[in-house]
A protein has these predicted regions:
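P-loop NTPase motor domains
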Residues: 1-177
């Protein structure tokens, strides 16, 4: 039986526990890569005959972004920041993504970007558009709310943070409402 039971409620986020996995990406490229795969649906991608290039390129780009925002925003970083980051790049013809990643305070973000840079220049914009499309659900108000740290009054009311590292421990259950 479950010993640690959590509730993620996207219908009524005020009744939800919180789950923010972005701060744990800081200085952990392997974890950031796993989170990137989870966020863009790597499991469903593996079950298709589609060209793996696009998904792999999106995953390495998102890995770089997660490492960057986890370093810049630390504990305040939430999944929506990844999409916000892409939108903030605007229409800079001189490749704003490249500038941001090359100047990132995260060495690991820079390394992930170097891998992304292996994609042909002509396809990089399309990769980032596809990535934003997959990240957009994280920008919706309910998703933002359930990934933000709880306020003091919410903690007093019983709201808890879900520790990502507990997910593989027996006895942990998360109910998605």
């Amino acid at each position: 039986s479950a010993k640690r039971i959590f509730r993620l409620d996207l219908n009524d986020p005020t009744k939800s526990d919180r789950w923010n996995f972005i701060p744990k990406c800081r200085n952990d490229p392997a974890f950031a890569c796993q989170v990137a795969g989870m966020m863009i649906g790597i499991e469903s991608r593996r079950k298709t005959n589609a060209d793996p290039f696009w998904g792999d390129a999106e995953q390495i780009a998102l890995t770089a972004i997660l490492l960057h925002i986890a370093e810049v925003y630390r504990e305040k970083a939430i999944p929506a920041f990844a999409a916000d980051f892409l939108i903030s790049l605007g229409e800079d013809g001189k490749d704003a993504f490249a500038k941001a990643m090359e100047n990132s305070p995260s060495l690991y973000a820079k390394q992930a970007y170097l891998a992304f840079r292996q994609a042909p220049i002509q396809t990089r914009g399309s990769i980032l558009i596809g990535l934003y499309n997959k990240l957009r659900p994280f920008t919706l108000a309910p998703a933002r709310m359930v990934t933000m740290p709880p306020m003091a009054e919410e903690i007093e009311a019983g709201c808890r943070n879900i520790d990502f590292s507990n997910l593989r421990k027996p006895g942990t259950a998360i109910y998605l409402v």
